[in-house]
């Protein structure tokens, strides 16, 4: 599979994986939405109950931080591969895949650290990791500092999992059963919507 990232074969592979996952999804058990059969209200479409969660200061601060952390993400997603190539990293797609591997590792670490650190400290570690990561990318353009680029890539797991995944868990806890779907949608709007504009 290595080496196809520079060809159109990567899209063929993605299409085949998508078809396989679509076929697999047909074998999953029927799970209707919790609100199935209930009337749709206009306030539900506007996520009015979720916006009420912004009244407590702690959730408002989290939402603002999530939005601000997402501002450079659009640039990261669009330009990191070309930036790494220009900085002299060989086989960029393989190098960047180590970021996803670290994400899997840290996803497994979250439950172990959740009890010890709690939500607040895990979010703080995640935010600090974003800062450190971008600093590594800024400082790693020289030949001597190239290892910082690789460390920045490996920090992807801490950055994403400790902030976004823990943030979604936190949102789920704060929102409660009734509005957790709206609350998750609102956070996605703040991060991948407003933040990445």
Regions found by a protein language model. Name each.
Residues 2, 105-119:
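Helix-to-loop junctions at the C-terminal end of transmembrane segments
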Residues 8-12, 85-104, 147-148, 185-186:
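Loop-to-transmembrane helix entry
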Residues 16-35:
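C-terminal membrane-cytosol helix-exit motif in multi-pass small-molecule transporters
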Residues 30-63:
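Juxtamembrane intracellular "pre-TM" segments in multi-pass secondary transporters
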Residues 58-66, 70-95, 164:
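Helix-loop boundary and gating motifs at the non-cytosolic
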Residues 90, 175-188:
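Loop-to-transmembrane helix entry/capping segments in MFS-fold secondary transporters
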Residues 128-143:
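C-terminal ends and interior cores of transmembrane alpha-helices
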Residues 162-176:
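Intracellular juxtamembrane helix-capping segments at the cytosolic ends
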